[in-house]
Amino acid sequence: MTTKKADYIWFNGEMVRWEDAKVHVMSHALHYGTSVFEGIRCYDSHKGPVVFRHREHMQRLHDSAKIYRFPVSQSIDELMEACRDVIRKNNLTSAYIRPLIFVGDVGMGVNPPAGYSTDVIIAAFPWGAYLGAEALEQGIDAMVSSWNRAAPNTIPTAAKAGGNYLSSLLVGSEARRHGYQEGIALDVNGYISEGAGENLFEVKDGVLFTPPFTSSALPGITRDAIIKLAKELGIEVREQVLSRESLYLADEVFMSGTAAEITPVRSVDGIQVGEGRCGPVTKRIQQAFFGLFTGETEDKWGWLDQVNQ
């Protein structure tokens, strides 16, 4: 049983009704986690519906598939057009978009047979702020998880793979069991990696800090946008290893991601961060980010892909 969120899903080149988009219970991905995916947002902007950093997301999807040696029949351009098609077909002006490449019913065994193919779906549906609309203004309470991120030579962190998110499930569910809204994972060396499903930033003395990818963090596309926007605002940005206690001593902390957008963190492990609310640097970056969709921030990078162009 599923909750219907839209009317149609793009499935291997065809528009299929939401309730008819089904896979076999013996699909390889269900047993072995053999899938890669993306999370993308379509915003209702001053230019009409726009997909944010569309090409970069589809490039990362292709890159994730390449890392795991999954064959993909569709080009990046074909997947982008499929995204636009499913948004239009569902009459959406703002949406969360979920492209997914997975290994279907190709037989049992960890290694798929020679010459196998993958299945591809793209769903688009309305979805608000991941951690709650009020969290964007008021911030959230987070905790450092007892679960570390895997070392980069065990699970490739550059790939956005379905199986990787079991780690995120452990980090996030532990936080919620203890009354927090989100968890923060450390890397195998005890330094900050990222949130359960978000990249992480700190502000100290007006400087913006974020962990490097070598700390087992996903190369976030929203993270990259924030770094570019911050530099445009004249904010110094440093990518460096960060200790757990730096979270307690930071003036501001926030999480970023397609789903989370830019969510302030008001406390970590019960210790108030800064003033315990959305800080001034975070607010400036939020305004610059959301200003892309109102026209208040110039899109110098060509990040907005118009759905109806």
Curated annotation (Swiss-Prot):
Pfam families: Aminotran_4 (PF01063)
CDD domains documented for this protein: BCAT_beta_family
Reaction it catalyzes: L-leucine + 2-oxoglutarate = 4-methyl-2-oxopentanoate + L-glutamate; L-isoleucine + 2-oxoglutarate = (S)-3-methyl-2-oxopentanoate + L-glutamate; L-valine + 2-oxoglutarate = 3-methyl-2-oxobutanoate + L-glutamate
Family: Belongs to the class-IV pyridoxal-phosphate-dependent aminotransferase family.
Functional description taken from the UniProt entry: Acts on leucine, isoleucine and valine.
Assembly with partners or alone: Homohexamer.
Key word Transferase present: yes
Cofactor(s) it depends on: pyridoxal 5'-phosphate
Enzyme Commission code(s) on record: 2.6.1.42
The entry's keywords: Amino-acid biosynthesis, Aminotransferase, Branched-chain amino acid biosynthesis, Pyridoxal phosphate, Transferase
EC class (word): transferase
Name assigned to this protein: Branched-chain-amino-acid aminotransferase
N6-(pyridoxal phosphate)lysine PTM sites in chain numbering: K160
Gene3D superfamilies reported in the protein's UniProt record: 3.30.470.10, D-amino Acid Aminotransferase, subunit A, domain 2
Organism: Escherichia coli (strain K12)
GO BP terms, alphabetized: aspartate biosynthetic process; isoleucine biosynthetic process; L-leucine biosynthetic process; L-valine biosynthetic process
Record's GO cellular component terms: cytosol
GO MF entries: branched-chain-amino-acid transaminase activity; identical protein binding; L-isoleucine-2-oxoglutarate transaminase activity; L-leucine-2-oxoglutarate transaminase activity; L-valine-2-oxoglutarate transaminase activity
InterPro entries, A to Z: Aminotrans_IV, Aminotrans_IV_CS, Aminotransferase-like, B_amino_transI, BCAT-like_C, BCAT-like_N, BCAT_family, Class-IV_PLP-Dep_Aminotrnsfr
UniProt pathway annotation: Amino-acid biosynthesis; L-isoleucine biosynthesis; L-isoleucine from 2-oxobutanoate: step 4/4; Amino-acid biosynthesis; L-leucine biosynthesis; L-leucine from 3-methyl-2-oxobutanoate: step 4/4; Amino-acid biosynthesis; L-valine biosynthesis; L-valine from pyruvate: step 4/4
Superkingdom of the organism of origin: Bacteria
